UniProtKB/Swiss-Prot annotation:
It is found in: Periplasm. GO terms for molecular function: hydroxyisourate hydrolase activity. Catalyzes the hydrolysis of 5-hydroxyisourate (HIU) to 2-oxo-4-hydroxy-4-carboxy-5-ureidoimidazoline (OHCU). This is 5-hydroxyisourate hydrolase. InterPro entries: Hydroxyisourate_hydrolase, Thyroxine_BS, Transthyretin/HIU_hydrolase, Transthyretin/HIU_hydrolase_d, Transthyretin/HIU_hydrolase_sf, Transthyretin_CS. PANTHER family: 5-HYDROXYISOURATE HYDROLASE, URICASE AND TRANSTHYRETIN-RELATED. It comes from Salmonella typhi. GO terms for biological process: purine nucleobase metabolic process. It holds the Pfam family Transthyretin. Belongs to the transthyretin family. 5-hydroxyisourate hydrolase subfamily. HIU hydrolysis also occurs spontaneously, but more slowly. Gene3D superfamilies: Transthyretin/hydroxyisourate hydrolase domain (2.60.40.180). Residues 1-20 form the signal peptide. The lineage of its organism: Bacteria, Pseudomonadati, Pseudomonadota, Gammaproteobacteria, Enterobacterales. Homotetramer.
Amino acid sequence: MKRYILATAIASLVAAPAMALAAGSNILSVHILDQQTGKPAPGVEVVLEQKKDNGWTQLNTGHTDQDGRIKALWPEKAAAPGDYRVIFKTGQYFESKKLDTFFPEIPVEFHISKTNEHYHVPLLLSQYGYSTYRGS
């Protein structure tokens, strides 16, 4: 049992820097705060899409962690300048709390001009309103 615990501890120490590096080099992160509770919104699905000639193409999807964050939403492919959007699937979040919402999905469009910068999209959320901005 001691060997198992030691092996698990060593494995997590080895993996943690690699995961932090991956998140640190990723150009896109999101964060959701529930304004009604003042707490993070965990488990919310977020979809990343790129604008194309005839609509939108999905690039990636993820779920917010216990802190309401997705630290690395950009897919492994290289970033390119262009128009993108993240869609926060908030309907299921409120449904799980047995609350109604006016906004079951919140699409946030943004433009990437410099692929060597980090883009952070925070969402401040309530049942009947939201706000967002370019974070850091």
